[in-house]
Amino acid sequence: MTCVTPTTPDVTPAVLREQMARWPTGVAVITTIGSGRPIGKTVNSFHATSLEPPLVGWCIDHRSSQFAEWMAADGYVVHVVAHDQAALMSHFATPSTDRFRGVDWVAGLDGMPVLVEPVPLRLECRVSHRLPAGDHTYLVGEVITITTSDAVPLCLKR
Ligand SMILES: Cc1cc2nc3c(=O)[nH]c(=O)nc-3n(C[C@H](O)[C@H](O)[C@H](O)COP(=O)(O)O)c2cc1C
């Protein structure tokens, strides 16, 4: 039997967040160079934007403790999280002044931090657009390099 909930005009932040969980997404750890140090965070707003030119994007919350550093960044590295890397997802979502403590990384494109742990997909990007949208800013990036593995991506769904 199909169960349909009533339509609601009550689109509060909590309602929207809860109901958008019906839209399955992957999860990515995004890294960059902040103020002289690597920074990174877990996101599920990441998605493909354009094929020609090759653009991807994700949205950063204006309340992020590192918002100014992300706005100043010229690029970012997308690490798509594998199905068995829930710990990596949690690590980069947990508040910390240094999420890179104990994490192996090397300098990649433009010196940006690349996680050594293999992931299904890694994209090194240069920022092409910074587009404010409500309480988030959309960071569009041109894909410069693509690295893949056979690992299966993690899928978040309700
Ligand atoms: C599954 C998941 C998805 C998330 N997606 C986003 C996102 O798309 N954009 C964002 O700014 N924060 C997102 N967050 C929150 C960040 O990972 C982080 O916890 C939060 O921004 C606080 O850290 P910060 O102060 O370094 O930004 C997500 C967290 C989780 C667990």
Predicted feature locations:
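Basic, polyanion-binding surface patches
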Residues: 1-158
